[in-house]
Amino acid sequence: MRFPSPLTEGRLVRRYKRFLADVELADGRVVTAHCANPGTMLGLIAPGRPVLLSASTNPARKLAWSWEMVQADLPGGPQWVGINTLRPNLLVAEAFREGRLPPLSGAATLRPEVRYGRASRVDFLAEGPAGPCHVEVKNCHMMREAGLAEFPDCVAARSARHMDELADVVRGGGRALLIVVVQMRAARFDVAGDIDPGFAAAFRRARAAGVETVAYACRLDPDEVTIDREIPIVTA
């Protein structure tokens, strides 16, 4: 997915109120950017870190800037990490259109935001000759061990509920798929059970029920972010 224009680099001043970040641009201006990430962003929000912002062309928007990436000092070396949790669904839709999602290779359409379960919406409903597949997408941006991407970075009760609802779909005779979009270079994925045992338990229950799970690492630069390759899920 190419950005409409190259991202603008700055340095993080502070992240606050969960969804706001002050960033100093190269010309010395300090702007407030929307931070579309409800997590703790563990290890990513130290003041002074290089960040990349996208600019909105919508004059009615309250905040003209969105925080897209941060350059993090991760185990194994520094790299750009995508923190915008609105991007993964767009990346999955793009990969589907381009035929780069093997688990959904038999689907003809991918409909977003379809109601199901206990007053929930599934991110996508894939439909085709083999029947529907409920698809949930999660963004991953945490790495505490070289090469190992982990989710979540905080207690994620809503995500745990999503896993249980996907399991209910399978128990009812349907098909369900979890796609973890890792917005950085990584070699493998695991759930962070020490941070959220509840999500880890729900993840394991869902897999045991037959929910399919797949993780994809991304390639990122100031011009583009794209799903790059599948990485193994090592959750026991």
Curated annotation (Swiss-Prot):
Molecular function in Gene Ontology: DNA binding
Pfam families: SfsA (PF03749), SfsA_N (PF17746)
Family annotation (Gene3D superfamilies): 2.40.50.580, 3.40.1350.60
Family indicated by similarity: Belongs to the SfsA family.
Protein name: Sugar fermentation stimulation protein homolog
Organism for this UniProt entry: Methylobacterium nodulans (strain LMG 21967 / CNCM I-2342 / ORS 2060)
Phylogenetic classification of the source organism: Bacteria, Pseudomonadati, Pseudomonadota, Alphaproteobacteria, Hyphomicrobiales
Gene field: sfsA
